[in-house]
């Protein structure tokens, strides 16, 4: 007699019949069947087996043919018995011993098991049949419900290192492996290292002992299928990527050469290096109006600003009306950037193009202290801290100049393309000149919002009062742009 039939004395009577009577009808297919081969580890979880399942009624009136029919077509089942123990009710009829798990026969193919494969089911953790089938918590994403009994092992092996058994981080060089074995194999191949074994070349390689013998570890890497050529191909791809980056940088510099931008800065640079305390003009307690002096210096700088713009690559190729629009939109920011960078060596003040030094106290006395302090803290101080050079200043000013959002442009996309070229050239310059400062390019760009905000505030407070007198700015700029380009 089978072990299943011998345990019938533990079963409770159902409907006037003993469960032993019910079980006898299944003897023909349960005898000699190894249930353990079909037990899914996820069904033993405390959360129970989730999902929608149907099972045939185990009833004495069903012979073997009745059982087979019920397995093939659940709709032909007699009225099932509802078990208060497992709470499932229809479409389940469960044989429930007082101790241990109950047994149900699912007929739903969605579980991934063959029809009629028995399952172990926890009677105290049943769920609604309308829920989706999910793996129990704790193994979700690691072990999946297999399509066949051996699927659990096939899925599990993808998540362990084939060399040492540690947790795999993915497929590396053809084999699922951990980061440690991946790095070990890559170093060995790239450096062309050779190892020797102190024992008999059959050392145990596992998670704890993988570092004891490098020879055996490397041999196991090869034996499990790691490919040396995969490492070499990876290195070649990295080399090609670096070459492409260099070519891209060179291409960007050819379109918008930073050397030309630097030449433009030097060409319009005022000769203020020889000023002394005597000719600074505005001492801290000077009665002179600092706003008037700033406006006079800005008026002078407008001439050189047009000259500077003409020297920026591709600016003169734009339509004349667009050139006027761009200068009109950015002149205040362009001048502020210039005198801010010129004032890096000055303490608590700014140095104008005329050689005059405006102290912070004078600005506060004139009622423009708030905006003056913003210039010192958000521009001058930041430029000083990062030691911004002339090339970087010129590129930032070129970015301000090529503003595609300026109203009235005939071709904003062309202006935007020129700005993108300046971005690319500046980034390539930072990488080449300051390789130890990977965030320098971003730091430079972060000065632009502050420059924009300060420029707008300066206009609001008439910081450049009477900048060009009674001459309309459009007419003034138009005359300057139509003048021949004086190369000095």
Swiss-Prot record:
Q: Where is this region: Modulating?
A: 1-160
Top-level taxon of the source organism: Eukaryota
Q: Where is this region: Nuclear localization signal?
A: 186-191
Question: Where is the crosslink of kind Glycyl lysine isopeptide (Lys-Gly) (interchain with G-Cter in SUMO)?
Answer: 134
In which residue ranges is the amino acid composition biased (Basic and acidic residues)?
Answer: 232-244
Region Hinge: start and end of each range?
227-250
Extract the ranges annotated as region (AF-2).
473-484
DNA-binding annotation, residue ranges on this chain: 158-233
What this chain does, per the entry, is described as: Receptor for retinoic acid that acts as a transcription factor. Forms homo- or heterodimers with retinoic acid receptors (rars) and binds to target response elements in response to their ligands, all-trans or 9-cis retinoic acid, to regulate gene expression in various biological processes. The rar/rxr heterodimers bind to the retinoic acid response elements (RARE) composed of tandem 5'-AGGTCA-3' sites known as DR1-DR5 to regulate transcription. The high affinity ligand for rxrs is 9-cis retinoic acid.
Quaternary data: Homodimer. Heterodimer; with a rar molecule. Binds DNA preferentially as a rar/rxr heterodimer. Interacts with coactivator ncoa3 and with senp6.
- Any domain commentary? Composed of three domains: a modulating N-terminal domain, a DNA-binding domain and a C-terminal ligand-binding domain.
Query: What is the protein's given name?
Result: Retinoic acid receptor RXR-alpha
Which species is listed as the source? Xenopus laevis (African clawed frog)
Per the UniProt record, the lineage of the source organism begins with: Eukaryota, Metazoa, Chordata, Craniata, Vertebrata
Gene it is expressed from: rxra
